């Protein structure tokens, strides 16, 4: 399994998951199409491995659990050479991001079913997170929206050539993704084919994942400052993805 679904197939599969005994006539009524049209979509779902037969017997879903940060990313891009201690002409752009969110998004584009587990606030940025997730097919069923909390933010300032001058993050809400937080979703995590984490998570949370998950754990470092959070669990990771600077910190070996 893992072949991508059309929007209509995804919609029909969702209804079947809610009621495996639903008839094709009822599905046709909900979709606003003919019963034969529904039959064709059901046939495609069977060919793609999502349904095993009439009834409907659903194939246990294979998926990846992605745990980490959702951010509102803000980028300041200088138009000319940067002058220190002064205002610089440039452009400012914003977009929903975060390492875990971006991994979830790209897995979806590759046709890999996944669930994102994260936290965000009830502020304006949090509403952007929700609308962006729905628009891009990111499943945030297991993301918690905290009241009276700010969504994680990341600010990057780059020069005219695209080289980063400084990056700042305000990710206090990610500290709420504790082992106790993840225990609410442990069945989702434990039944995943693989688990992906990023190093924005608290050290104790990373340790909990590596101690309790029996499937492969993949980790992505988010910054030099947070790379050290993965040091205690390196031996338990299946794969670690990091930059040159981050690799030097983790291994202690200079990269030339």
Predicted regions and their residues:
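Glycine-rich beta-alpha junction loops
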Residues: 68-72, 121, 223-225, 246
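Short glycine/proline-enriched coil/turn segments at helix->beta-strand junctions
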Residues: 20, 32, 112, 190-191, ...
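Glycine-rich phosphate/adenosyl-contacting loop at the front of the ribokinase-like
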Residues: 2-17, 22-30, 34-117, 124-128
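Conserved N-terminal subdomain of the carbohydrate kinase-like
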Residues: 60-61, 80-90, 109-193
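Conserved beta-alpha-beta core of the PfkB/ribokinase-like small-molecule kinase fold
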Residues: 194-256
């Amino acid at each position: 399994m893992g072949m991508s679904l059309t929007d209509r197939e995804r919609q029909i599969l969702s209804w079947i998951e809610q009621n495996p005994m639903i008839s094709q006539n009822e599905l046709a009524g909900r979709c606003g199409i003919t019963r034969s049209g529904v039959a064709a979509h059901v046939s495609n779902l069977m060919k793609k491995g999502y349904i095993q037969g009439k009834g409907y017997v659903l194939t246990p879903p294979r998926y990846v659990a992605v745990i980490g940060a959702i951010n509102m990313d803000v980028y300041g891009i200088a138009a000319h050479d940067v002058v220190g201690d002064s205002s610089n002409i440039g452009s400012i752009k914003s977009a929903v991001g975060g390492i875990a969110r971006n991994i979830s998004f790209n897995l979806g584009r590759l046709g890999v079913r996944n669930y994102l587990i994260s936290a965000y606030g009830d502020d304006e940025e949090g509403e952007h997170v929700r609308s962006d997730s729905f628009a891009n097919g990111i499943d945030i069923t297991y993301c918690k929206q905290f009241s009276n909390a700010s969504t994680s933010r990341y600010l990057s300032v780059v020069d005219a050539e695209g080289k980063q001058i400084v990056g700042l993050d305000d990710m206090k809400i990610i500290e709420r993704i504790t082992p106790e937080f993840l225990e609410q979703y442990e069945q989702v995590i434990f039944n995943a084919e693989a688990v992906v984490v990023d190093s924005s998570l608290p050290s104790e949370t990373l340790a909990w994942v590596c101690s309790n998950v029996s499937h492969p754990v993949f980790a992505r470092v988010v910054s030099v400052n947070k790379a050290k959070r993965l040091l205690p669990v390196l031996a338990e990771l299946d794969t670690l993805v990091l930059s040159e600077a981050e690799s030097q910190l983790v291994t202690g070996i200079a990269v030339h």
